[in-house]
């Protein structure tokens, strides 16, 4: 069957659902996927630096964060993107909580974060977040156990960063700072295809050596980490509101 034949073929998905299933299983993600329903388009002000690819790599941090800063934190069993634990440093109410800012009756956008008791144990991380100068929401350290490429791909997702974010306020994006040194591990990024799933033709990798910094629009890009090391990988993930302050920080941190 040629591509022209496919274009003109009748829609038999309702009469023969097993044919639709055969098409779906050709993608490595199960469908329907919750990420596919997260909005891509909105009127929120966004960063020019992310317009083209949805991410920007920044220069490496000159003075890496000491391991005593992140090993002493209180971690919670919370799964996202693999076998993970998270240490909340800033949350909606300052409590140790890995959930979003959407508690029933107290829904709010992922901004105006309040530091938790973990922040007292990592003063350099706290200073780093504050030095960006932009409004931050969730701030946390992720601990990720090793996972190979195929395992990682099955955990790809997009983030619902802008739920409850007023459309006239800055689009929320996320920054990464690698705390451990795993240069053979990488962040895997893909754009969404017309079927609402990650498009392998757009796959990009960002290496995860110690001190690596980058900013991602994780509501736009499907993402996950392939961690090939033999020890846990730690990284700082921070939500920031797009706007002049974040733009100035990006300009300062470009290579």
How would you describe each model-predicted region?
Residues 188-255:
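Catalytic core of Fe(II)/2-oxoglutarate
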